[in-house]
């Protein structure tokens, strides 16, 4: 029996990220490079999105797989620190938290990610209980643990609960089925181009749309985002100019902030604007989660009438 309800229930991937910051550009092969600094933060598509939503005031819970290893304990401690409920997250010995090493180049502000997965990750096939999913106002998921993601999305669809998703891989044969169960499809341009075969953001957004969609958002970094809702009109949200130092986690923060705006009743354009601001502010600090802004920080930033990049020709 569920004792409490949540604004956003996340079922997907979490990780522990070790970030190494190096001077110049990414090191060449067979060279020795000095590390400027080292940092450990939690990450993962769903994990980072939930932290972002929680900092923006949403009541969040994580119900994806956690292991009994040291990295899983780090993830648990981080969620508790951020106010994310983990009481419904299944624990399993064969589900250690993924670990990533991220090399961030100071000069080019680019990153290379090296990750290790040693067992099951993401959604469990049978947990959480259906009542837990029905207690949420929004279900957030990624593609990790496909059978569990499909189960959760079908339960949410039957209950009329909107599904927001963060995808980075379409290779699983059941991915198209999962995509059709997502109400708010928020994708980076390169991934959306891959699954549609289209090029221009406006065309890509229309190609991603399906009859059960509430919204499609295609994110394009400093070029901003293109989005459309039920009216079928594609609109553009410019990116805000910030002093970016690291883009790690920006896409996941965008997803979490979008979900937070959605659960708080904001219209589509304001959800995208909120998400754009949150992702931009995150980019001003290194790592995937430490730089995630609070609601107050985002509101103050938007109130300052921040400069945006010009709308590019497409």
List the predicted regions and their residue ranges.
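Conserved phosphate/ATP/ADP-binding segment of small-molecule kinases
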Residues: 150-236
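Glycine-rich phosphate/adenosyl-contacting loop at the front of the ribokinase-like
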Residues: 1-65, 70-74, 81, 243-244
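Active-site glycine-rich loop that binds ribose-phosphate moieties when present
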Residues: 120-129, 147, 166-173
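Conserved phosphate-binding/catalytic region of the ribokinase-like
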Residues: 1-9, 34, 201-314
């Amino acid at each position: 029996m569920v004792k409490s309800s949540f604004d956003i229930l996340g079922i997907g991937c979490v990780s522990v990220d070790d970030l190494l910051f190096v001077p110049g550009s990414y090191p060449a092969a067979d060279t020795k490079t000095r590390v400027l600094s080292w940092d450990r933060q939690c990450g993962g598509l769903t994990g980072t999105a939930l932290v972002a939503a929680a900092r923006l005031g949403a009541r969040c819970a994580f119900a994806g797989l956690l292991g009994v290893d040291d990295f899983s304990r780090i993830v648990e401690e981080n969620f508790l620190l951020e106010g994310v409920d983990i009481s419904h997250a299944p624990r399993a010995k064969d589900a250690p938290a993924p670990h990533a090493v991220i090399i961030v180049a100071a000069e080019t502000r680019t990153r290379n990610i090296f990750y290790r997965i040693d067992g099951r990750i993401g959604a469990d096939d049978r947990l959480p209980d259906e009542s837990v999913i029905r207690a949420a106002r929004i279900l957030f998921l990624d593609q990790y643990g496909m059978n569990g993601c499909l189960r959760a999305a079908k339960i949410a669809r039957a209950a009329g609960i909107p599904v927001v998703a963060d995808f980075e891989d379409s290779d699983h044969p059941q991915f198209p089925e999962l995509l059709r169960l997502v109400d708010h499809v928020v994708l980076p341009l390169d991934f959306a181009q891959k699954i549609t075969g289209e090029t221009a953001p406006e065309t890509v957004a229309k190609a991603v749309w399906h009859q059960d969609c509430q919204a499609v958002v295609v994110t394009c970094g400093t070029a901003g985002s293109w989005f459309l809702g039920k009216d079928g009109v594609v609109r553009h949200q410019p990116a805000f100019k910030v002093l970016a130092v690291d883009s790690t986690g920006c896409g996941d923060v965008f997803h979490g902030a979008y979900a937070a705006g959605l659960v708080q009743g904001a219209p589509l354009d304001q959800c995208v604007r909120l998400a754009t601001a949150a992702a931009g502010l995150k980019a001003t600090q290194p790592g995937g989660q430490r730089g995630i802004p609070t609601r107050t920080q985002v509101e103050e930033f938007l109130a300052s009438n921040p400069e945006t990049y010009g709308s590019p020709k497409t």
